[in-house]
Amino acid sequence: MRVAALYDIHGNLPALDAVLAEVDADVVVIGGDTVAGPAPAETLERLRSLDADVRFIRGNADREVYEERQGLAPPEVMEFVRARLSREQIDFLRSLPLTLSIGRVLFCHATPRDDEEILTRISPDERWREALAGVDAEVVVCGHTHVQFDRQIGKVRLVNAGSVGMPYAEEPGAYWALLDGTDVELRYTRCQAPDVSEWPVEWPQASDDEATEFFEKLSREQS
């Protein structure tokens, strides 16, 4: 079974549409942080209206929408997003699970135990083993830090699919993953930049190394 893993779309409709034009898969997994961006309602409805097997999990920013609490996202961002979503759309976000399994692959947003936990490609194996404790999967696919990576933690292959809508990378574009069973291919799609003229904060940009160092510092503060 071919599965496309699209993570951290962040309301970036041009990036999503560019990726969807390339996706050839039996299942599309939406890995969380779907709406926190310039076009939240339009992005969610594009995904929900697809004539495809689309399965969602929640991310921390999705949860912050319906919990109406301060999280990792700036408050003005969440106010912007909530104001553009219908009550039905917010209830849909509320219904999303933390994880999803397809065969021997487990999909989660950040880690299997927490949608906000920060671990990176350079986090010590010991910390990843703690986060993966009890996981009975051959492959774990995550996102959250917007940087693609592929590493082995014990018997578990750990893959970060990257970010479709807000990647931290040297090359602008959309980053995602395509799985065929437990085989994984990290993918990149060229796309137009989103319209951020109404976006309330500066649209974030960083290289993968800069972002990894930043998130690793946050990770140490969390531990």
Segments from the language model and where they lie:
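Active-site environment of divalent metal-dependent phosphoester hydrolases
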Residues: H10-A15, A36-A39, A61-Y66, R113-D115, ...
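Active-site-proximal segments of metal-dependent phosphoesterases and phosphodiesterases across multiple
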Residues: G71-E76, V105-V135, P167
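Acidic, His/Gly-rich catalytic cores of divalent-metal-dependent hydrolytic chemistry
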Residues: Q152-S223
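Anionic-ligand binding region
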Residues: I122-R151, V156-V159, A174-W176
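Active-site-proximal beta-strand elements of phosphoester/diester hydrolases
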Residues: R2-H10, R104-T111, L158-G162
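Glycine-rich phosphate-binding loop signature in dinucleotide/nucleotide-binding domains
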Residues: E22-D24, L50, I102, A133-D136, ...
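Core catalytic region of metal-dependent phosphoesterases/phosphodiesterases
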Residues: A4-R94
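Short acidic-hydrophobic surface loop/beta-edge motif
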Residues: L98-G103, R151-I153
